[in-house]
Amino acid sequence: MKRVLTALAAALPFAAHAADAISGAVERQPTNWQAIIMFLIFVVFTLGITYWASKRVRSRSDYYTAGGNITGFQNGLAIAGDYMSAASFLGISALVFTSGYDGLIYSLGFLVGWPIILFLIAERLRNLGRYTFADVASYRLKQGPIRILSACGSLVVVALYLIAQMVGAGKLIELLFGLNYHIAVVLVGVLMMMYVLFGGMLATTWVQIIKAVLLLFGASFMAFMVMKHVGFSFNNLFTEAMAVHPKGTAIMSPGGLVQDPISALSLGLGLMFGTAGLPHILMRFFTVSDAREARKSVFYATGFMGYFYILTFIIGFGAIMLVGANPAYKDAAGALIGGNNMAAVHLANAVGGNLFLGFISAVAFATILAVVAGLTLAGASAVSHDLYANVFRKGATEREELKVSKITVLVLGVIAIILGILFENQNIAFMVGLAFAIAASCNFPIILLSMYWSKLTTRGAMLGGWLGLLTAVVLMILGPTIWVQILGHEKAIFPYEYPALFSISVAFLGIWFFSATDNSAEGNREREQFRAQFIRSQTGFGVQQGRAH
């Protein structure tokens, strides 16, 4: 049992490594012209899609949700494209390359939040909401306060995630293409703004679908070539890997990377519940016509992602055999050229030559663009729909709301570029963990309880939600990553690296206590309205479908 618990604990802290995959030491590579040419082909193609989409974006619904006309299969691919990052592709395969079996457990950690979304979130979210998850949270509660809280939670998560992605983009492109870091960051920012500004959700969706297809194809080809090398025998794969790896048979044992079980559990909870609170993921469920398609979206997305993470495991072991044992991929000191995070890239060269290496490098860049486009649209919708149209200027026309959304896209893009450049040499690994912690501590409790707990009131949601958000931020600042490593203090005030275990508890307890003790007339009215909301969430009665959505 102890061994099982250790393995489960090891499955949880993936996000720190995923962030490190794009924020660690980077050795700039020679200019890769094949990769640049393939990437330019991708850019031209996706800009063509953006132009096509811009001709079909005629309303607010078209811009935010692609008119609600995306199918479950298409949306599943887009969700997978939005969630599968370059960090997971390079980082998890690098982890398998260095640590073996632990990499498989880590990769499974990516999936633990999706059953929650499938069984608890997707159907009710689609039946109750229109454009953002704040539509659901405020369905029977006070619009103003709840939308402000939801928008703040969304914007903080988007900002943290976006900074981490932009810094990672610059480092990764410097690593893969040999381009200057600043040029890479500006290029990602400009393309991101163009996709979202002109094409809205329709262009963003197709960029994510294309990226997912390319990534799945590339990873499948690499895994196929690795298995072909060992006669399609997993026994041969593991035997050959153990024979050449410095750790020998130890790479087949789990638990070698666990240092602090509390931090591991905390990060795992942040990942599990944070996935169900990520605004750019939740927004995707409004692009389909009904709850049935929303469920199908999660089903397909989970299948695609599960398949992808199995491939990264094979790729990692293939890299042990074909890259780790090949001196052509080592520098004078015997280390992997470009660092361990180049393991999958070197394997692409080993199994497919320079042309396939260029393809995989271009796919890694496309992966970043797909993720940041989704983040930007989620942030823009929080400002324009939740804050502008429903709080500060109620009754604003669709045209005014879309204008504000597009201005927000430009502002977010410029801020992302500036912060990406400013944070070039900073430790941004903590930002991914903090983004998940805030999503889990603020967004997720409010979404879940607003849909399932009849006694929830505005007072409880506001106080509990703000407590969860602030607790996550304060504990992260006082923890070892920021307080010691960044601010330079000798000892951390909060001893654990990730705060989600504590901040989620504070959020749920706060929401329960302040709702249970709310005896106001407004609170009683909100409780009475739960039955009507419940019927709507179960039946979808009154939900608009398709282009009318």
Curated annotation (Swiss-Prot):
The chain crosses the membrane at residues 33-53, 77-97, 103-123, 148-168, 183-203, 206-226, 262-282, 303-323, 355-375, 404-424, 428-448, 464-484, 493-513. Keywords: Cell inner membrane, Cell membrane, Ion transport, Membrane, Sodium, Sodium transport, Symport, Transmembrane, Transmembrane helix, Transport. One of its GO terms (biological process) is sodium ion transport. PROSITE patterns: NA_SOLUT_SYMP_1, NA_SOLUT_SYMP_2, NA_SOLUT_SYMP_3. InterPro entries: Cation/Ac_symporter_ActP, Na/Glc_symporter_sf, Na/solute_symporter, Na/solute_symporter_CS, Sodium:Solute_Symporter. It comes from the Bacteria. It is a multi-pass membrane protein. GO terms for molecular function: acetate transmembrane transporter activity; glycolate transmembrane transporter activity; symporter activity. The keyword Membrane applies. One of its GO terms (cellular component) is plasma membrane. The keyword Transport applies. It is found in: Cell inner membrane. Transports acetate. Belongs to the sodium:solute symporter (SSF) (TC 2.A.21) family. This is Cation/acetate symporter ActP. The lineage of its organism: Bacteria, Pseudomonadati, Pseudomonadota, Gammaproteobacteria, Enterobacterales. The gene is actP.
